Design a protein with these regions (language model features):
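Residues that scaffold the ATP/ADP-binding catalytic core of kinase and kinase-like folds
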Residues: 13, 34, 79-80, 93
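Divalent metal-dependent hydrolysis catalytic cores, especially in the metallo-beta-lactamase
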Residues: 114-162
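Active-site-proximal flexible loops/turns
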Residues: 14, 68, 78-82, 132, ...
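Active-site gating loops and adjacent loop-to-helix segments of metal-dependent hydrolytic enzymes
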Residues: 80-112, 146, 151-168
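Conserved beta-strand termini and adjacent loop/short-helix elements that scaffold enzyme active sites
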Residues: 34, 60-61, 153
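N-terminal metal-binding scaffold of metallo-dependent hydrolase/deaminase domains
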Residues: 1-46
């Protein structure tokens, strides 16, 4: 899919992070061009291409176009449990409410709940996550099926005792 975003305020991650008016050209998952507006011929010349036909052209109407956010701490399969008994202290919430519910969840439940989480991430501008949760195979499959980037991280904690009693 070849996309042409134009009439956009572009925030690059270059030093100074200035916002400039311009356009972005993409092909598949690659950004071909991000910069000031110019004629198609001028940009094709910069890209060393004869021509480029777009599948879709999107007028951003002056809206901000920027790189996607990365969420470095997610539990995708538990997104739907976020507000479940959320008025309790953390350890009580986890031990008495969340862990018993999670014990009943199947890998397929976690797969479907992860897909729901991915939709939430995308509506928030998140394009990649670091996820740590049960049944990593289900999580990986959901991200692969939805076409989103995910790094699986193993747990580095032990909730079986209080923080005061844990050894470093």
């Amino acid at each position: 899919m070849k996309l042409h975003f134009f009439n956009a305020r572009i925030l690059s991650m270059e030093e100074g992070m200035e916002i400039t008016m311009g356009e972005v050209w993409t092909e598949g998952t690659r950004i071909l061009y991000a910069g000031p507006s110019a004629t198609k011929q001028e940009i094709c010349r910069k890209l060393q291409r004869e021509d480029l036909e777009f599948n879709r052209e999107i007028d951003c109407d002056g809206d901000l176009l920027m790189p996607g956010f990365k969420n470095a701490h997610t539990h995708s399969g538990m997104t739907a449990l976020r507000s479940y008994a959320d008025d309790l202290p953390l350890n009580e919430w986890l031990n008495e409410q969340i862990f018993p519910v999670e014990a009943k969840m199947t890998p397929e439940d976690i797969y479907e709940l992860s897909r729901l989480a991915i939709l939430e991430y995308l509506t928030s501008g998140v394009t990649a996550v670091f996820d740590m949760y049960l049944t990593p195979e289900s999580i990986a499959r959901s991200f692969e099926d939805m076409g989103m980037r995910c790094v699986q991280v193993s747990a580095l904690n032990n909730f079986s005792q209080s923080l005061e009693l844990m050894e470093e």
